[in-house]
């Protein structure tokens, strides 16, 4: 009985160490979740992914879609609806800022430091009666210098 408990405890400890080894360090995204992006060029992210604009020392992480009331595909709606995405932005080593962007023209972009971050696209559209699974979203962003 005691040997069985020791084996179980050993398995739990080994599993915990394995999961810890896969975690990111100090909030930094894993290398597989970071893609390179260029200033002024659209880049597309899945939830949890980060784009790094090295020339500007900027990072944009697509955290998640917080709301999606857009008109479903193959449905005729009176209003188009909107979706809201949450992003985390880090500029030149400063503290991370959390921002929200919407798919409506008046709220699709915001200023982050000396930059303008625009939500250029969010796919897929929902299907009637079936919401989009969070992991299926893809958001396209563009980072440009803010107008002076």
Question: What kind of feature is each model-predicted range?
Answer:
Residues 29-80:
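N-terminal secretory signal peptides
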Residues 120-148:
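C-terminal partner/receptor-binding element of secreted or periplasmic proteins
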Residues 76-84, 134-139:
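Short coil-to-beta strand junction motifs in C2/discoidin
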Residues 23-26:
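Bacterial signal peptide processing site
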Residues 18-21:
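C-terminal motif of bacterial Sec signal peptides marking the signal peptidase cleavage site
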Residues 103-121:
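Short Fe-S-cluster ligation motifs
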Residues 1-11:
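Bacterial N-terminal signal peptides that target proteins for export
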Residues 81-94:
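Iron-sulfur (Fe-S) cluster-binding segments and ferredoxin-like electron-carrier domains
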């Amino acid at each position: 009985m005691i040997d069985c408990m020791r084996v179980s405890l050993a398995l739990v400890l080994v599993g915990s160490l394995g999961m810890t080894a896969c975690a990111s360090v100090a909030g930094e995204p894993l290398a597989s979740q970071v893609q390179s992006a260029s200033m002024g060029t659209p880049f597309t992210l899945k939830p949890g992914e980060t784009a790094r604009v090295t020339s500007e020392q900027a990072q944009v992480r697509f955290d998640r879609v917080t709301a999606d009331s857009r008109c479903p595909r193959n449905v005729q709606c009176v209003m188009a609806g909107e979706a809201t995405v949450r992003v985390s932005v880090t500029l030149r080593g400063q503290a991370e800022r959390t921002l929200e962007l919407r798919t409506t023209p008046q709220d699709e972009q915001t200023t982050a430091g000396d930059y303008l971050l625009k939500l250029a696209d969010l796919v897929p559209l929902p299907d009637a009666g079936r919401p989009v699974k969070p992991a299926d979203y893809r958001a396209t962003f563009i980072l440009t210098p803010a107008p002076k």
